[in-house]
Amino acid sequence: AGPTESPAAHPNAPWIIVDIVGTGPNANKLQFIGKESLEVEHTLEVAGRLGHSHFPEYTARGDFFYVSARYRGDRSQGLPGGQLVIYDAHTLKQVKSIDVDVPAGVFSHVRSRSVTVGLQPPVPH
């Protein structure tokens, strides 16, 4: 449905999650690719019709995932700026949301302790 910026996967979760970046009509959606089928099995609208959904990330055990949802809201009229939204990784049901003015980035402390694929180790001197 469009280019992705931050795919997320976890050994204990059934899907690879991809966000859709850009300004098109799918920028508010996440897609769930089955690990066995390698096909899009689910699409989830997170941030409303005019919003963006970014940076999906699984929790350490893979039971949940969270995503930054920006709503393009007009806060002067009481509309939300954005949220960090948490979902059950198996049912895809929303568990919780936390208001955040401009949610963007990776919030997982696990990522900082994991190996980044593609980076070469430093050369010893």
Regions found by a protein language model. Give the residues of each.
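Predominantly soluble domains enriched in secretory-pathway, periplasmic, or organellar proteins
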Residues: 1-125
